[in-house]
Amino acid sequence: MKTKQWPSKTERHKRFGSVPPVAGKKPIHKEEMADLQNMPNDFLFALDSVGIHNVKHPCIIQSNLKPYEQTTVGTFSLTTGLEQMSKGINMSRLTELLQEYHQTGFILSLKNMQAFTKDLAERMEQSSAHVHVTFPWFFERESPSLNKIGLAHAEARLNVHFDETLGFTHEVGLTAAVTTLCPCSKEISEYSAHNQRGYVTIKATFYEPTEGSDDWKVTLLEAAESNASSILYPVLKRPDEKAVTEKAYENPRFVEDMVRLTAADLYENETIKAFTVECRNEESIHQHDAIATLSYSKK
């Protein structure tokens, strides 16, 4: 075996372009550094929002479905307003506060998100703040015939805005995957009907933005799934697959049907103030998707 004449790691780095630090003249201590963001002047416009986006961070969620508590990964957007006389914000404070909440066992709920958003505005010394987070939510599901258990999932989201004059506004959301079977295909065909995976996205606001004993994730999930041709399952054996196939055939749905039926459930929920429903089907006989949307406010 041949042995190479091997340079040291320092020499290797030098050979590949690394250079020693420059003996600079600018200060290295925070107290001596210029703070451009805090230099007051007339900067022409106030900003609606400024901050950080696409921040991945672990967080805890609770649910009325098993597992009742789980750690997931949230994707956060943290922003605040900015006054005309301020050049910028101290963005490091945004992730500092998120880490502080994480260390205390931050549970993602509407109530806790309101507290976090208000703290964010105060920490940043701004009159408003906005927090948006999306996260995967996992829940146990049994197959329809043999009761085989597996973990299904949906994409959940929380939006909270705080304004020191107007107070809080909020919106919750969920995207659930379902099966939709085409009513037209069933009607015109001697046998069978094309079906596909559909994605139902619901956004809702409540009269009272507290979860209490109700889990908004479950509320939105049931509104979407209970109106589909069939729901999706992580584990299916042959008897289960037969049950799923037949149920879908018995409950054909257009995208138009899905948004209207889902909206009817949301309308009947007395805690919900306003909502938007979208259904997007990945058409199995086309290269395009089918889509329908509906918005309603009970004001």
From Swiss-Prot:
InterPro entries for the chain: GTP_cyclohydrolase_FolE2, GTP_cyclohydrolase_FolE2/MptA
Function: Converts GTP to 7,8-dihydroneopterin triphosphate.
Enzyme class: hydrolase
GO molecular function: GTP cyclohydrolase I activity
Record keywords: Hydrolase
Region annotation (Disordered) ranges: 1-25
Site (May be catalytically important): 182
EC number, as in UniProt: 3.5.4.16
Protein name listed in UniProt: GTP cyclohydrolase FolE2
Family classification: Belongs to the GTP cyclohydrolase IV family.
Example GO biological process: tetrahydrofolate biosynthetic process
PANTHER family named in the record: GTP CYCLOHYDROLASE MPTA (PTHR36445:SF1)
Pathway given in the UniProt record: Cofactor biosynthesis; 7,8-dihydroneopterin triphosphate biosynthesis; 7,8-dihydroneopterin triphosphate from GTP: step 1/1
Origin organism lineage: Bacteria, Bacillati, Bacillota, Bacilli, Bacillales
HAMAP family, per database record: GTP_cyclohydrol_B (MF_01527_B)
Reaction catalysis annotation: GTP + H2O = 7,8-dihydroneopterin 3'-triphosphate + formate + H(+)
Organism annotation: Halalkalibacterium halodurans (strain ATCC BAA-125 / DSM 18197 / FERM 7344 / JCM 9153 / C-125) (Bacillus halodurans)
